[in-house]
């Protein structure tokens, strides 16, 4: 259920700050959000898959930590990212 190479490359090019940027918080949060959305679809069909649910919770927590970091570092980048991804925060 992981993202394909093409999907990852598309997300990286959409959210990168400069060419070759794969480690900025924006890129990491966008990749985690795509993985989370994909896993949510998996759980609609496989409700008893508790091992994958643990991984989902871990991804959600990692995304939350990265968003908190970005919010403390640069509020305008945080607000832009939240708007682009459609997150509730």
Curated annotation (Swiss-Prot):
UniProt key word Ribosomal protein = yes
The entry's cellular-component GO terms read: cytosolic small ribosomal subunit
Q: Which GO terms describe its molecular function?
A: rRNA binding; structural constituent of ribosome
Keyword Signal part of the UniProt annotation: no
The record's function comment reads:
One of the primary rRNA binding proteins, it binds directly to 16S rRNA where it helps nucleate assembly of the platform of the 30S subunit by binding and bridging several RNA helices of the 16S rRNA.
A Gene Ontology biological process term: translation
Top-rank lineage group of the source organism: Bacteria
The UniProt entry's sequence similarity note says:
Belongs to the universal ribosomal protein uS15 family.
Write down the species: Pseudomonas fluorescens (strain ATCC BAA-477 / NRRL B-23932 / Pf-5)
Q: How does it assemble?
A: Part of the 30S ribosomal subunit. Forms a bridge to the 50S subunit in the 70S ribosome, contacting the 23S rRNA.
Q: Which UniProt keywords apply?
A: Ribonucleoprotein, Ribosomal protein, RNA-binding, rRNA-binding
Q: Please spell out the taxonomic lineage of the organism that makes this protein.
A: Bacteria, Pseudomonadati, Pseudomonadota, Gammaproteobacteria, Pseudomonadales
Name of this chain's protein: Small ribosomal subunit protein uS15
């Amino acid at each position: 259920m992981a993202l394909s190479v093409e999907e990852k490359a598309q997300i990286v090019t959409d959210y990168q700050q400069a060419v070759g940027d794969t480690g900025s918080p924006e890129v990491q949060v966008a990749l985690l959000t795509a993985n989370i959305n994909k896993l949510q679809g998996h759980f609609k069909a496989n409700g008893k898959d508790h091992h994958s649910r643990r991984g989902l919770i871990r991804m959600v927590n990692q995304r939350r930590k990265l968003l908190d970091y970005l919010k403390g570092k640069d509020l305008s980048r945080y607000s832009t990212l939240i708007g682009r991804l459609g997150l509730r925060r």
